[in-house]
């Protein structure tokens, strides 16, 4: 499958590497050009998201926040400039569900499908799948996504319609951060009363 991948940070770079190693034809792009250097041997380095998306069947987005996702997908040099009807966009970033709906409206008018596919780290090596991926979208689109997402996922689940994957990820984050805060408060309480 022809795949574009935008965003080669600490999560995106290993995801992209595993996509290429699983036999997909990969084009990559990052706002920091040096981030692409490690993938030059296995991927085409693109000058923009639009360049990366030329001929792509699936485009993956793994950038920092809602604003960056919108720019990568819908901006002047965004994915929509090159993706053809029938293509699929996967959002791996953790963003607001309202932002997903905004993207869906813009992409649907162009015949491009959208699946939210946020990831949660499980384990990490350079050669093995290392994340749990939560998918939200229509069943046919999710089935298409599995062919790519399976390259880097230890587990992947279809959580429901568009937004359900993101809701599951945000809920997971809430539980994780709540446990961290409770743990810190419990430690302070114990220390205050002299518990070693």
List the predicted regions and their residue ranges:
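A generic structural signal for alpha->beta connector loops
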Residues: 23-25, 42-43, 86, 111, ...
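Residue-level signature of catalytic and energy-coupling elements of molecular machines
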Residues: 4, 90, 145
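A general structural signal for well-ordered alpha-helical segments in protein cores
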Residues: 36, 56, 66-70, 76, ...
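C-terminal substrate-binding/catalytic lobe of Rossmann-fold NAD(P)-dependent dehydrogenases
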Residues: 184-185, 189-196
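Rossmann-like NAD(P)(H) cofactor-binding subdomain of soluble oxidoreductases
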Residues: 49-53, 58-61, 65-131
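NAD(P)+-binding Rossmann beta1-loop-alpha1 motif at the extreme N-terminus of oxidoreductases
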Residues: 1-62, 192
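Rossmann-fold dinucleotide-binding core
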Residues: 94-177
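Class I S-adenosyl-L-methionine
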Residues: 17-20, 37-40, 70, 104-108, ...
């Amino acid at each position: 499958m022809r795949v574009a991948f935008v965003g080669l940070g600490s999560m995106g770079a290993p995801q992209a590497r595993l996509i290429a190693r699983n036999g997909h034809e990969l084009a990559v792009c990052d706002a920091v050009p040096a981030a692409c250097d490690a993938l030059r041997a296995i991927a085409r380095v693109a000058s923009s998201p639009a360049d990366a998306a030329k001929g792509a069947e699936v485009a993956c987005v793994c950038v920092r926040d809602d604003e960056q996702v919108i720019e990568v997908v819908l901006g002047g040099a965004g994915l929509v400039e090159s993706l053809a009807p029938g293509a699929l966009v996967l959002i791996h970033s953790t963003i607001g569900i309202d932002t997903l709906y905004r993207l869906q409206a813009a992409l649907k008018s162009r015949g491009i499908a959208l699946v939210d596919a946020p990831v949660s780290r499980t384990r990490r090596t350079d050669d093995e799948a290392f994340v749990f991926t939560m998918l939200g979208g229509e069943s046919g689109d999710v089935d298409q996504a599995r062919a790519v997402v399976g390259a880097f996922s230890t587990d992947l689940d279809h959580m429901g319609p568009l937004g359900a994957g993101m809701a599951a990820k945000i809920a997971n984050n809430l539980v994780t951060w709540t446990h961290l805060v409770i743990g810190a408060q419990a430690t302070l309480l114990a220390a205050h009363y002299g518990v070693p």
